[in-house]
């Protein structure tokens, strides 16, 4: 049905986040009908999607990317060509690994600060200007300390991406031990009923095993 819908357009730009092997299979099926495909997953979360500054990671033929670059830039802050079909989703999986590990690191650090009797807000302010500063730190540390787990990106969706990353890693004999550990952490959160919360709720796992509660000090 996808092929019939795009037949006259001659190209399918798939912006979903899926296993790279699925992108390749879809592309092969479309190619039999003379239709090109780009796999073009995005990153940046809901806020950047709303304001049109998401990052797009694109796989497919270079000439097809060049042809539709301006179209992609109408909705994005950046659109980067990564390589042949499936490469966009490889980049997205790499992105999701980095985001998950960073959120876990922020959670672990703020748990340490709180358990040591130090105001996590002041620790956050102290480190955000140094090498540990990052987009993830600035986006997720305040959410953790404010106990705001309204989903920008849900745990269950991040689990889907990490599962795809593990499958992709196994397919090419790449060991992904941190990804596997994060999957187990998220599985624990799912068992606690947190799967529909924002992935910043990873901090709850650390709170549970350390018997501590991360939040801003009340003035």
What are these regions (language model features)?
Residues 17-96, 100:
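Rossmann-fold dinucleotide-binding core
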Residues 119-128, 180-184:
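Beta-strand segments within the central parallel beta-sheet cores of soluble alpha/beta enzyme folds
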Residues 187, 191-219:
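NAD(P)-dependent dehydrogenase/reductase Rossmann-like domain
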Residues 85, 89, 133-135, 139-199:
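Interdomain hinge/lid region at the active-site interface
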Residues 51-59, 80, 84-116, 125-139, ...:
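Active-site-proximal catalytic alpha-helix in oxidoreductases
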Residues 13:
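Catalytic-core elements of nucleic-acid end-processing and repair enzymes
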Residues 1-7:
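Short, small-residue-biased leader/transition segments that mark boundaries at the very start
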């Amino acid at each position: 049905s996808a092929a019939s819908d795009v037949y006259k357009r001659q190209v399918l730009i798939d912006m979903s986040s899926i296993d790279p092997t699925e992108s390749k299979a879809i592309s092969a099926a479309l190619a039999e009908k003379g239709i090109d495909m780009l796999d073009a997953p995005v990153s940046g979360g809901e806020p950047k999607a709303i304001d049109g500054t998401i990052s797009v990671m694109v796989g497919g033929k270079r000439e097809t990317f060049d042809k539709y670059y301006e179209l992609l830039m109408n909705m994005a802050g950046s659109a980067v060509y990564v390589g042949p079909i499936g490469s966009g989703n490889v980049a997205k999986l790499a992105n999701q690994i980095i985001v998950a590990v960073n959120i876990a690191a922020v959670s672990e650090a703020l748990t340490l600060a709180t358990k040591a009797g130090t105001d996590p807000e002041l620790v956050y302010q102290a480190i955000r200007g140094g090498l540990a500063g990052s987009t993830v730190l600035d986006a997720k540390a305040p959410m953790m300390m404010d106990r705001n787990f309204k989903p920008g990106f849900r745990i269950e969706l991040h689990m889907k991406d990490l599962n795809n990353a593990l499958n992709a890693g196994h397919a090419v004999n790449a060991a992904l031990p941190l990804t596997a550990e994060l999957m187990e952490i998220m599985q624990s959160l799912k068992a606690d009923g947190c799967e529909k919360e924002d992935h910043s709720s990873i901090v709850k796992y650390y709170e549970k095993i350390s018997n501590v509660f991360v939040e801003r000090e009340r003035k």
